[in-house]
Design a protein with these regions (language model features):
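Post-transcriptional modification and biogenesis factors for structured RNAs
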Residues: 1-204
Length: 204
């Protein structure tokens, strides 16, 4: 099971009765703790009174490919926890089949990453520690086209519907320096997401 144990204050148990009824039905152990103890268990300034101990969920690239994905996000050297979590959440909202993190990316289970996914990390397959070159080659071999999200690429609206409808892995580079040149050599196409407002750039 995903949730191993819950730590909660008495106030939280009173505020979220449905949550703890479900925990009891699932035979999840609940430990009542004081406010100071709960605050020591979390790094947030104002914790909500409940801390869950959960299993870390890992997926294998082979399993992802075997499931014939239509949309995959591949994060290359992403270092900022907030950005990583936001991409996970956006990928989930877009109906992505998986998110793959390269071996030089931020820890997926960094507390800031987990919080910024707002739960998406628990129901979207995530592959961690992937070698970029090997992963791209494996995806290509499975018939998945590789697009790099790059400001200097072809404008997204210029791509045909047929092209966008094919199984695709979107590669996103580091926040500060973008892509390694050798990574761009492996992709099928560099694509720029247009910015219509006054924003200077997107996060990734």
């Amino acid at each position: 099971k995903l949730i191993v144990e819950l730590f909660a204050t008495e106030d939280a148990v009173e505020r979220y009765p449905d949550l703890f009824e479900r925990a009891e039905s699932a035979r999840i152990e609940v430990q009542l703790v004081s406010e100071p103890v709960l605050k020591a268990l979390t790094d947030t300034t104002t914790p909500q009174g409940v801390v869950a101990v959960c299993e870390q969920l890992h997926s294998d690239l082979e399993d992802i490919i075997a499931a014939k994905p239509q949309l995959v996000a591949l994060l290359a050297n992403i270092r900022d926890p907030g950005n990583a979590g936001t991409v996970l959440r956006a990928a989930d909202a877009a109906g992505a089949d998986a998110v793959i993190f390269s071996d030089n990316s931020v820890d997926v289970y960094n507390p800031k990453v987990v919080r910024s996914t707002t739960g998406s990390i628990f129901h979207l397959p995530v592959v961690i520690g992937a070698d970029i070159a090997t992963t791209i080659e494996s995806l290509k071999s499975a018939g998945i086209q590789i697009f790099a999200a790059n400001g200097g690429g072809a404008e997204l609206p210029t791509l045909s519907k047929d092209q966008l409808a094919k199984p695709t892995a979107w590669v996103m580079g580091n926040e500060a320096w973008g892509f390694e040149p050798e990574t761009l050599e492996l992709v099928d196409l560099e694509v720029a997401v247009p910015i219509y407002g006054a924003a200077e750039s997107l996060n990734l």
